[in-house]
Amino acid sequence: AEPPAEPTAETQTVEETAPEATEEADEELPEETQSEEKQVISTVPQYFQNDYPYTMYGSGTIMTSGCSIVSLAMVASYMADHAYTPDELAHYFGGRAINNIARLEYGNKMLQLACRKAENWHVVYKALQEGQVAIVLMNHNSIFTNSQHFIVLAGINENGKIIVNDSN
């Protein structure tokens, strides 16, 4: 089955997964994909940047510039035997922002999470079909932001829609 049209975003796929989410993308999957068995994932925690208005992160706070650390906290909590919070990870990384792919990979390494960088949307979609989750960097052409913004793709629901954990 073919994945939906390729979004214009850098992606990172985190392995060993199975999730929950809160928002669902409006984009329908191709009909032949919808007839396949779907994996419903419901255990990725949801955190929000607005819950951390005073926790320093990079040159701002988690609320103003912490989508990457919030996304990492969601996935790390899901993958590890520990409920990581965004403020805990911000302190762990010394308040240094990890708002790019290389630093996010570093965060995964420091937390000893299995991850791999996906080269295109097809790799991400296949990972979701296999029950994995993904942290993706959306660009200004997406419905999530007018600049850049990290979100978590937490799976594919029973209706064939991608489950999105958005920190905003």
Describe the predicted segments one by one.
Residues A1-G95:
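Active-site-adjacent structural segments surrounding the nucleophilic cysteine of cysteine proteases
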Residues S71-N168:
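Conserved active-site-adjacent core of cysteine acyl-enzyme catalytic domains
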